[in-house]
From Swiss-Prot:
Keywords: Amino-acid biosynthesis, Arginine biosynthesis, ATP-binding, Glutamine amidotransferase, Ligase, Nucleotide-binding, Pyrimidine biosynthesis. Composed of two chains; the small (or glutamine) chain promotes the hydrolysis of glutamine to ammonia, which is used by the large (or ammonia) chain to synthesize carbamoyl phosphate. Tetramer of heterodimers (alpha,beta)4. Its EC number is 6.3.5.5. This is Carbamoyl phosphate synthase small chain. The active site is at C284 (nucleophile), H368, E370. L-glutamine binds at S56, G255, G257, L285, Q288, N326, G328, F329. It is an enzyme of class 6 (ligase). SMART domains: CPSase_sm_chain (SM01097). Small subunit of the glutamine-dependent carbamoyl phosphate synthetase (CPSase). CPSase catalyzes the formation of carbamoyl phosphate from the ammonia moiety of glutamine, carbonate, and phosphate donated by ATP, constituting the first step of 2 biosynthetic pathways, one leading to arginine and/or urea and the other to pyrimidine nucleotides. The small subunit (glutamine amidotransferase) binds and cleaves glutamine to supply the large subunit with the substrate ammonia. One of its GO terms (molecular function) is ATP binding. It catalyses: hydrogencarbonate + L-glutamine + 2 ATP + H2O = carbamoyl phosphate + L-glutamate + 2 ADP + phosphate + 2 H(+). Residues 207-395 form the Glutamine amidotransferase type-1 domain. It comes from Rhizobium meliloti (strain 1021) (Ensifer meliloti). Belongs to the CarA family.
Length: 401
């Protein structure tokens, strides 16, 4: 990979320093400072605010493969973390082109100002295609991203920092990303020209308890849109506390970090919840937590799956869906025990993307059916979960699609 082009005379104001000693120079954007993180790439063309505020990206620097990011500005609605002030999302960002002036009727501010407010350190003006190709070849590297408007850097110290960081393996970041308190969620999905509406107390027909490992807002909105009263509880909530809320269904949320580390406290809770006949649905980290609770294993991926254009096959329907993905760990399909069926696979690399327990109202997926951003091919999974709740109540099933 090359640093700044040879014809550039501007002094670099940001550096990306990889653990192998590679130094990439560029122009600084967003917040100033230095942070250690894992570098990944995302292939989505749109939805950069939702990507950067997704708690699953905590501990990561996101490289956008699409060259023009920020030209529709930033707004106060396209946010996915529950507590924006806590900044539970990506810690760094890399763009090909500099951020232009925004042009969109929803824009409330320039993306650079928004990045500063979020504390996201950024770099632009580099060959993101070369960086992406490097990641595909070598895997997601540990790195340091640094931004100093004066362009003053201790490169050797940054190299040492990048090399010394242990990476995401073994890190329980769910305890950081979780909201830390129980609360009721009633905001419904966004509607054109109307914005967000709320679910009335009398309209709530079902009660879902969501274990928050770093949950995205749009997941909760889709539950509310199906007339579910959602109670969000912290990641370390006990099974007894969950069951005391008398849920009709239990949801295991997405989140960041190493599932094996989070599983040290989450797996025993889920195993106790599985002793009941309450329907259980998991997404992303929640899928991995469920797999661990059932006796399977998880593993670190080479380059991860990050984007809004990933093909997945649903073996339960035979259909191929284009979905959003964001994960750097995966369930080892060969470790799934007897009685647990693999329901979805990635058509990029064949990795596991879903499971269900035979004869039980329990299933999960690795991808993000709520999208935000991305296609809505998998929205039916929320109705599938609701139908498990309805079946338990003796109510007829709704059409999934």
């Amino acid at each position: 990979m090359t640093a700044t082009p040879a014809w550039t005379i501007q002094k670099p104001t940001a550096l990306l320093v990889l653990a192998d000693g590679t130094v990439i120079e560029g122009k600084g954007i967003g917040a100033t400072g230095t942070v250690q993180a894992e570098v990944c790439f995302n292939t989505a063309l749109t939805g950069y605010q939702e990507i950067l505020t997704d708690p699953s990206y905590l501990g990561q620097i996101v490289t956008f493969t699409f060259p023009h990011i920020g030209n529709i500005g930033a707004n106060d609605e396209d946010i996915e973390d529950l507590t924006p002030a806590a900044r539970h999302g990506a810690v760094g960002v890399i763009f090909k082109a500099d951020i232009t002036e925004p042009s969109n009727y929803r824009a409330a501010k320039h993306l650079d100002a928004w990045l500063k407010a979020r504390g996201i350190i950024g770099l632009c003006g580099i060959d993101t295609r070369a960086l992406t190709a490097w990641i595909r070849e070598n895997g997601m590297p540990n790195a340091v991203i640094a931004h100093d408007p004066a362009g003053v850097f201790d490169v050797e110290a940054l190299k040492a920092e990048a090399k010394a960081w242990s990476g995401l393996e073994g890190l329980d970041l769910a305890k950081v990303a979780t909201s830390g308190q129980s609360y009721r969620w009633n905001e419904k999905p966004w509607v054109w020209n109307e914005g967000y509406s709320t679910l009335g107390e009398t309209d709530a027909a079902y009660h879902v308890v969501a274990l928050d490992y770093g949950v995205k807002r749009n997941i909760l909105r889709l539950f509310a849109g199906l007339n579910c009263r959602v109670t969000v509880v912290p990641a370390q909530t006990s099974a007894e506390e969950v069951l005391a809320l008398k849920p009709d269904g239990i949801f295991l949320s997405n989140g960041p970090g190493d599932p094996a580390a989070t599983g040290e406290y989450a797996v025993p809770v889920i195993q106790d919840l599985l002793k009941t006949d309450i329907p259980v649905f998991g997404i992303c980290l929640g899928h991995q937590m469920l797999a661990l609770a059932l006796g399977a294993r998880t593993e670190k991926m080479h380059q991860g799956h990050h984007g809004a254009n990933h093909p997945v096959k649903d073996h339960t329907t035979g259909k191929v869906e284009i979905v959003s993905m964001n994960h750097g760990f995966a369930v080892d399909a060969n470790s799934l025990p007897q009685g647990v069926e693999q329901t979805h696979i990635s058509l990029f690399d064949g990795t596991n993307c879903g499971l269900r327990v035979d004869g039980r109202p329990v299933f999960s997926v690795q991808h993000h059916p709520e999208a935000s951003p991305g296609p809505q091919d998998s929205h039916y999974l929320f109705r599938r979960f609701l139908n498990l709740i309805r079946e338990k109540k003796g109510e007829p099933a709704l059409a999934e699609r």
